[in-house]
Amino acid sequence: MPSAIPRGLLLLAGLCCLVFGIMAEDAQVAQGPSQQIPRSLAHFAHSMYRVLTQQSNTSNIFFSPVSIATALAMVSVGAKGDTHTQILRGLEFNLTEIAEADIHNGFQNLLHTLNRPHSEHQLTTGNGLFLDQKLKLKEKFSEDVKTLYHAEAFPTNFSNPKEAEKQINAYVEKGTQGKIVDLVKDLSADTVLALVNYIFFRGKWEKPFDVKHTTQEDFHVDTSTTVKVPMMKREGKYKAFHCSTIQSWVLLLDYEGNVTALFLLPEEGKMQHLEETLTPELIFKFARKTERMFANVHLPKLSISGTYDLKEVLGHLGITNVFSDAADLSGVTEDIPLKISKGLHKALLTIDEKGTEAAGATMMEFMPMSLPEDLSFNKPFLFLIIDHSTDTPLFVGKVMDPTKK
């Protein structure tokens, strides 16, 4: 007989983390797939960004849509009924247009591509299943998450929460190369399964900034608040242009390899307009721009992070059952009814001058006689980090105050 005590599943993403718990006994239970995954991820990122801005329009935002979506897609493998439908719809998949098998195969291909070794940059993802020693997973769920999501399984003694926390945090710290530490705290002894996804990216600018040119400058948080920030500077030929639709300047800074940072600088007082008019379709269009212009770029050094309660955020996207006693995760295990008792997402970003002494650093750029356009990111702006090989939004952010971690 299943225990009548609610138990939890912990979900950690980007780190993204979901905690699964046992429920009470009486709980109620067109495009090709390879193109559909990035498109759906872009729409999911857009929806999640809007939820986060509604919660606070004065805070920095930073999250990894691909990390959160991967963790949820893994959960959907074992979900049934409305729980299953809510997850896939919340991830912006139209189940009348794409088969579920194609969704999971699409994630498999995406993860395989993202994890290919690159000499130019580091981009790795990982999925871990931490199982209570007494919990027996269904064979199909176990095989599917290993095959499709390359998940590793680790036996865990959740009856000793401190040891379980230590084990999960060590996995996360290693996967993120020490960037995310002590993510899991106050773990409940009722937890029986933790599902962890992490993503780690380290890139070098194709055209690095010179440290000697970085100086302290003003950043205008709002009309009444100004802070001093280290501002990087570089004059040269950039993929940059003004878009009247969103009333913003768009700047693309390439990393070595297939990754690009896309920065969006709204005109004075037009941040809300930018947020209301920016669409995934425009982002894809911007990312493919190739024309260049001469510009004098001023970009603040950044070290920001985002930590989010996924239960609250995803609830606004219609994903509610999986966090409640209405959850049907009967495809995960027959031993006990599960629900996600806690969902955590943490992502960190550092942007600085670093680059290699490669073509970008030594490349000759002839300047026109006219003055270059001055693109100074000295006020709030948006940005995305996009993988071109898959058209996937790896990270999404909004900088309101670069001095806030």
Swiss-Prot record:
The keyword Secreted appears for this protein: yes
Description of what induces expression: APS rose several hundred-fold during the acute phase reaction.
InterPro entries associated with the record: Serpin_CS, Serpin_dom, Serpin_fam, Serpin_sf, Serpin_sf_1, Serpin_sf_2
Glycan attachment positions: 57, 94, 157, 258
Gene Ontology MF term list: serine-type endopeptidase inhibitor activity
Pfam families named in the record: Serpin
Region (RCL): 360-379
Residues marked Reactive bond (site): 369-370
Keyword set includes Signal: yes
Cellular component per GO, a single term: extracellular space
Annotated localization: Secreted
Annotated signal peptide: 1-24
Family from the record: Belongs to the serpin family.
Biological function: Inhibits elastase, chymotrypsin, cathepsin G, plasmin, and trypsin.
UniProt remark on domains: The reactive center loop (RCL) extends out from the body of the protein and directs binding to the target protease. The protease cleaves the serpin at the reactive site within the RCL, establishing a covalent linkage between the carboxyl group of the serpin reactive site and the serine hydroxyl of the protease. The resulting inactive serpin-protease complex is highly stable.
Name under which the protein is recorded: Alpha-1-antiproteinase S
Lineage: Eukaryota, Metazoa, Chordata, Craniata, Vertebrata
